[in-house]
Amino acid sequence: VLSPVSGPSETPVLGTEVESASVVPTLAVLHLADLFRNPKMRVPANRDWAKIGAYLRGDWPLPIPPRLIVGPERGYEALWGGQMAGLVERAVGAEFVALDTEYAPQTRLLHTIGVGWDSGGVVEGLQVLQTPHLSHVGRDRLTDILHAIMTQVPVVYQNAVGADLPVLEQAFGLRYADHKRVDDLMLAHAELWREWPHDLGFLASMYGVYPKMKHLAKQDPALYNWGDVLDTICAWQGVVKEMAQDPPVRQLYEEALQLIPILLESHKRGLRVAKSRVEPAIVEYQERLETALRLAWSYAGWKINLGEAQLKEQLYTREEF
């Protein structure tokens, strides 16, 4: 079933439930003929088609679980409430917690943090919004809460090295060494299925049991973040089961995990370079780039920007390559 989605043309996300203009629930999946072109997508396609039966039975998607939302509307007072103490107690008693951050990509300034867990089939969590508005006391309190959780229970991140761990250290001073254990969902899935995408949207299509929320980044940022937390929980539970059936892959994953602190430290230090060799090379290659640009302008007849989509337009639209 292909969805007649209105608006800008985009590649449909596998397993996305959307609504057309006539308000008909539609499940967007790969066309079966596409498997002749891309056979490696057979398993994801099978899982998507299997959702039809679950949908008709009312088993999918499941209702979105509740979470405690803490924000500036009430001065973040819930950080000190009795409900928070109960949440932390249940979090540290879970098998693992999933943690997801939302931040400004250029500055890594954190603005939303979500933590969720599955306690015997009951999924719940905590969300703190607009963290830059926290007072010093509130920030210290949130730091203590996060520290209490991560020192007592394994934490699963979607992308520990490339996103969440550096953001948490910048915002709260919480480091890799403060964790009981760090698990990386993207890394684990890459060990299992190297030929597939490893982004959270794809993983939600493969393992998710809740409505898609990846499209809510601007409409409802809080629900978008909570959706990432829920999808991380579901995907990690699925990946753990798959690794249990393939012990060599589990061993490879455990070995790869040992690189996380090394990579974090190397990202801080950067690369050591021989300036005496690099600086002259920069001048040489800059001259080559300028020459190439002038040649492109002369050939195209206009000041084409080789670093943007204009090159694609020139080659495929005008030259018809």
Regions from the PLM with identified roles:
Residues 1-66:
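Glycine/proline-rich loop-helix segments at beta-alpha junctions forming the active-site rim
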Residues 26-29, 96, 123-128, 155, ...:
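Conserved beta-strand scaffold positions in the cores of enzyme catalytic domains, especially
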Residues 120-156:
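Nucleic-acid-processing active sites and adjacent nucleic-acid-binding tracks
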Residues 30, 99, 158, 183, ...:
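Active-site flanking residues adjacent to catalytic metal/cofactor-binding acidic residues
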Residues 106, 113, 161-175, 186, ...:
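Short active-site loop/helix that positions an aromatic residue
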Residues 33-38, 127-140, 180-225, 230:
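Short alpha-helix plus adjacent loop in nuclease-associated cores
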Residues 1, 98, 153-164:
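Acidic beta-strand-to-loop metal/phosphate-binding motif
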Residues 51-131, 220, 225-321:
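Conserved "right-hand" nucleotidyltransferase catalytic core of DNA-directed polymerases
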